[in-house]
């Protein structure tokens, strides 16, 4: 049994939860260009069929906090001849934005530390005063990218909070963290 309290993959306690923020395509494209050489992510670790940002995703019917993400990926593609690489290297994560967000970030870090995946790029609400920033992100992330302005999430309009990318990468050097900032739209145009 996982040490995490069980949540479905997009953290919904009930239909229509306010924890679900669907990522705008330009944000995903920016992340793909910056951290994945323009390639699509292998796995979206918190999605549903309507908002997935990778060909394979962990949906509402699976507890994303208790499954091995690389194993989930392999099980999803093993019989599909269009996939030639069984490695789940780059994961996209726009976790639920409620109390379970720190649990998803901890899981992302654990997946990288265990060697299951190479990199997890997370889009989160930028709340640098929180415990998760001080205890997990600042001491373990390879990069934090503070996004200029507020994002407009699909179906929700502009967020009432700042956003940032947090990247956990197995290639992190010297236990250092890169801090960057800027717009995401201009970077991909």
Features from the language model and the residues they span:
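Class I S-adenosyl-L-methionine-dependent methyltransferase catalytic core
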Residues: 1-189
């Amino acid at each position: 049994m996982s040490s995490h309290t069980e949540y479905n993959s997009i953290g919904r306690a009930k239909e229509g939860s306010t924890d679900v923020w669907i990522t705008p395509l330009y944000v995903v494209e920016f992340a793909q260009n910056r951290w994945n050489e323009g390639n699509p992510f292998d796995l979206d670790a918190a999605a549903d069929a309507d908002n997935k940002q990778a060909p394979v995703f962990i949906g509402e019917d699976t507890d994303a906090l208790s499954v091995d993400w690389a194993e989930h990926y392999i099980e999803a593609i093993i019989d599909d001849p269009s996939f030639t690489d069984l490695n789940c290297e780059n994961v996209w994560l726009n976790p639920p934005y409620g109390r379970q967000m720190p649990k998803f970030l901890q899981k992302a870090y654990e997946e990288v530390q265990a060697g299951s995946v190479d990199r997890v790029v997370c889009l989160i609400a930028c709340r640098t005063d929180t415990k998760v920033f001080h205890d997990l992100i600042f001491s373990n992330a390879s990069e934090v990218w503070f996004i200029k302005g507020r994002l407009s999430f699909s179906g929700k309009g502009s967020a009432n909070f700042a956003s940032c990318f947090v990247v956990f990468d197995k290639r992190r050097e010297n236990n250092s963290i890169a801090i960057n900032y800027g717009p995401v739209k201009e970077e991909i145009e």
